[in-house]
Amino acid sequence: KRLDADAPLGFLLSGGLDSSLVCAIAAKRLPHKIRTFSIGMDVDAIDLKYARMAADYIGSEHTEVIISKEDVIAALEPVVALLGTYDITTIRASIGMYLVCRAIHETTDIRVLLTGEISDELFGYKYTDFAPDAAAFQHEAEKRIRELHMYDVLRADRCISVNSLEARVPFGDLAFVDYAMSIDPALKMNRHDMGEY
């Protein structure tokens, strides 16, 4: 249902598991090539490598937005202003999204963007790696879901909408969130030092 749109769709693709999954499912379901976008620095852009691999695998029309240190510095003040927070982690994570969305708005006809946001909160990530047991994992996951509006959703909503784009977050579907949160948290714990489940 997130793929129905009156305007052209685009997909943010970091090369990580979450955005790659969203893009792969969309590529299978849509009758045309999807358009994917990634962003990286002009030096040491390891994420671009993985995004390119995912894009090649699913056969998307892929665009890489390359940014410099100067681009990041110039974006800092407007990003802090639009977020309305000085939370360092949120600001750091927002700069790339802000710049890629600005590039999409300025250079394409894309007006709707799908992202892989919220899956970390549902299935665990760095902040749940050290949970001593399943109950602590679930407690932290529930806390992260309750606070989404202060961090990831804040970042995605504002960085995307300030660039006149509409955000769609498949992992945020309420039925899916209910299902994911009902999974035994012991199954989501990082027991093998392999990252996400």
Task: Describe the residue ranges of each PLM region.
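ATP-dependent adenylate-handling active sites, centered on carboxylate activation for C-N bond formation
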Residues: 1-197
